[in-house]
Amino acid sequence: RLCFINKCDRTGADPFRVLQQVRDKLKLNAAAVHYPIGLEDQHDGVVCLVTHKAVTFSGKSGEIITIGDVPEHLRDQVAKKRKELVEAVSEVDDTLGEFFLREETPEVEDLRAAIRRATIARTFSPVFMGSAFKNRGVQLLLDGVVDYLPAPHEVENVALDLDNDEASVTLTADPKAPLVGLAFKLEEGAGLSQSPRSAFAIVHTRPAKGALRP
């Protein structure tokens, strides 16, 4: 699982207080993979603690993304939070734990791979930060889905065979097999114009087997 602390642009935003609540109330081994660049009306972006790069968002919808060095005034805090991240993952990943014991700094790919292993094993939850309304940090959250969550062929999905007394069937991620998926959201009347003739339903589907083709 991934966590996203939203509304870092709101008055009173305190993402690390929320992170502590995630640990205390949900009992998760969680640590931030982001450090906010400013809060409330000063929130401009985040520092990625994995890549050690500052990512800022501008434009009307956060569509202009700038990647640069960590601001000097944040370097001490960023170093501290990155160390916390490495410690949290090291507790549940032996490979990264060796870096920690040797007091070595892991490379970006080493840390990213360790976070992925621990996330898939459900022993660690990476915590992202941003503002969904202003589209800041959402792009990095989607990158996190790719980087840290399992691909379809890496998990076991089970369906019910309706023609065989609802017997359980294990699905394999074979694109040539008959389509099986989960329709998890329906938007009725989601036409591209206001004309009744153009109204149709959009079905959001998560395929587990096979492929959906027009």
Descriptions of predicted regions:
Residues R1-P214:
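Structural and coupling elements of P-loop NTPases
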